[in-house]
């Protein structure tokens, strides 16, 4: 603290400025006398207390840690942009039934695992409930009823499903777009046949998993 209040001249500084050098004791006595003369109302005890105090740092600068910049989320393409770019279109050279048979085999294994093996004693209602919420891409689907006679009998592997249509590749390598509205479809796997009423099935595949389907006695097209 003493060094913060006063500092003794070096021999060279004293000689350069023509200042008489003081010993440490004389310098300390000078400071005490100066304080007593400058602040006469302060007692000797308070002066000693002030001399013993630590220096107060008026300003203290800390290095601020650089804030991490938020990562920019990659913005994907919108549904309209994907349609405009025709990303969902199946190229003519890829419209071959044999090309998607492995997909059908994968789908059958997926449904067997989903229904715990499709055993003969399995309740049909349970299989129906599972199929309604399952991913149908790769299933062999048939149109059994329709208000448009030309759709009846169309059978093939389901390649794409949207909210309103099924896209099916037939054994003749024809890509058919079948509307769900006013059509009844069947899906068969391991001798189990499930009926799908398209008019009540107008949902995206991702939305069906959370949809609660209610059993009804009869449904018209």
From Swiss-Prot:
Q: Its quaternary structure?
A: Component of nuclear RNase P and RNase MRP ribonucleoproteins. RNase P consists of a catalytic RNA moiety and 10 different protein chains; POP1, POP4, POP5, POP7, RPP14, RPP21, RPP25, RPP30, RPP38 and RPP40. Within the RNase P complex, POP1, POP7 and RPP25 form the 'finger' subcomplex, POP5, RPP14, RPP40 and homodimeric RPP30 form the 'palm' subcomplex, and RPP21, POP4 and RPP38 form the 'wrist' subcomplex. All subunits of the RNase P complex interact with the catalytic RNA. Several subunits of RNase P are also part of the RNase MRP complex.
Per the record, the major location class is nucleus
Subcellular compartments: Nucleus, Nucleolus
- GO terms assigned for molecular function: ribonuclease P activity; ribonuclease P RNA binding
**In its UniProt entry, what is this protein called?**
Ribonuclease P protein subunit p29
Relate the protein's function as given in its record. Answer: Component of ribonuclease P, a ribonucleoprotein complex that generates mature tRNA molecules by cleaving their 5'-ends.
* Positions of modified residues (Phosphoserine): 10
Q: Mind listing the UniProt keywords for this protein, alphabetically?
A: Nucleus, Phosphoprotein, tRNA processing
The lineage is:
Eukaryota, Metazoa, Chordata, Craniata, Vertebrata
**PANTHER family xrefs:** RIBONUCLEASE P PROTEIN SUBUNIT P29, RIBONUCLEASE P SUBUNIT P29
Q: Which family does it belong to?
A: Belongs to the eukaryotic/archaeal RNase P protein component 1 family.
Q: Name one GO biological process term.
A: tRNA 5'-leader removal
Q: Which GO terms describe its cellular component?
A: multimeric ribonuclease P complex; nucleolus; nucleoplasm; ribonuclease MRP complex
Q: Which InterPro entries match?
A: RNase_P/MRP_Rpp29-subunit (IPR016848), RNase_P/MRP_Rpp29_sf (IPR036980), Rof/RNase_P-like (IPR023534), Rpp29/RNP1 (IPR002730)
Supply the source organism for this entry.
Mus musculus (Mouse)
């Amino acid at each position: 603290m003493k060094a913060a209040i006063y500092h003794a001249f070096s021999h060279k500084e004293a000689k350069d400025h023509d200042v008489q050098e003081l010993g440490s004791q004389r310098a300390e006595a000078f400071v005490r006398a100066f304080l007593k003369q400058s602040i006469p109302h302060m007692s000797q005890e308070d002066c000693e207390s002030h001399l013993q105090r630590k220096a107060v740092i008026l300003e203290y600068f800390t290095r601020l840690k650089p804030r991490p910049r938020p990562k920019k989320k990659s913005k994907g393409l919108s549904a309209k942009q994907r349609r405009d770019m025709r990303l969902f279109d199946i190229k003519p050279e890829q419209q071959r039934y044999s090309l998607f048979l492995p997909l059908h085999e994968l789908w059958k294994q997926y449904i067997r695992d989903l229904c715990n093996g499709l055993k003969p004693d399995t309740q049909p209602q349970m299989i129906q409930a599972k199929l309604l919420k399952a991913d149908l891409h790769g299933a062999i689907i048939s149109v059994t009823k329709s208000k448009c006679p030309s759709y009846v009998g169309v059978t093939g592997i389901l390649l794409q499903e949207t909210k309103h249509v099924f896209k099916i590749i037939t054994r003749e390598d024809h890509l058919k777009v079948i509307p769900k509205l006013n059509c009844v479809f069947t899906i068969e796997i391991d001798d189990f046949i499930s009926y799908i009423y398209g008019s009540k099935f107008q949902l995206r595949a991702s939305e069906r998993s959370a949809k609660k389907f209610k059993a009804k006695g009869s449904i018209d097209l």
